[in-house]
Amino acid sequence: RLAGMLNLDDTLAVASRTLMAQIDSLTQGGDVAGLTQVKRAQVTLADQLFRDNLPAPEIQALLSSINLDIYRRVVDGALAAMAAEGLGPPPVDFSVIVMGSGGRGESFLFPDQDNGFILDDYPDSEHLRIDAWFIDLGERMTRDLDAIGLPLCKGFVMATNPLWRKTLSQWKAQISLWSRKRGTTMLRLCDIFFDFKSAWGRDDLADDLRRHVAETARGNHMFLREMFEDDQDHGPAIGWFGRFITMKESDAVGYKGYLNLKHSGTLPLVEAMRLLCLREGLAINPTLERMQALEDRGILAKDEADYLRGAYRHISHLLLRQQIKDFQAGRPVTNFVHPRSLTRREADMLKNSFEAIRRLRDHMRNEFTGDVLQ
């Protein structure tokens, strides 16, 4: 199985024998207690691979792959329990989808849950019976994932919410509606949803919906323009004369002077690559793969793509390193990094990374909105 851009076996080849044995144990057992240990072992795994100089995006791909395995085992366990309780098998085929960073294969250490169900179509007359069954499954799945170490989503982006639990036809209608009746809330729902990936069940349901998303967004200039404008809150943290724009106390208590390397680092680049791929009708999720596809099509110049790849890798490296340090020191694991924790070379590279992202977004502003910066 591929873990992002790197074959899983190749990834494991750089780990010590102890870690390889630990990883092998990930395939053993599927109860909540065992999977909790699997989740906890991810920090040790990430730290060792980091020390072995594996690039951060490839560590993220491996962490995401492990999280998908956790999803599969949790769903298998929930289905077995429901069958044992006399609730029967699933009334229709379905796919469990994971969204956000998990859908892109770019999870850091402690992502929360972003999941949903795509159900095969069924008669409206059967809705109450079938939906009740999937509500039960969704409650079991999200409860167990939370117990294991994948926290409940504070924004309720979970299969327990009917907004994220629909038949394939309902999902297609929802996407078409979002593309026509635009607004801040709907645009942000699109941002969450458009990176979905099938984690369990009928992959073809997710593939069908992915094609519909690509067909709906491609050429829909007003929709893409409004998505770009809504993403403007997440800009690279670089100001005049190449100075970092750090956080205020009002942004996050106790983190004044820090950089939020997710909201002002990886996120602006992730959003830009997603938007360009939507415009081109490309059904690709991982950010680096999106960059490569856009370069292959001539949308990104070779040098520009090279700068952006370097930016993504460097920011991800700094963020993952900080999360590992915070966890090991018993501090809350966040997306915040203080500039003083960086070497001069790292800080210079980060400024160059932010500048590359800003240049891209300035160019996209002209393309998507027609606005030219003075």
Q: Residue spans of the language-model regions?
A:
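A nucleotide- and high-energy phosphate-metabolite-utilizing enzyme signature
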Residues: 18-374
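Short beta->alpha transition motifs characteristic of CBS
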Residues: 2-18
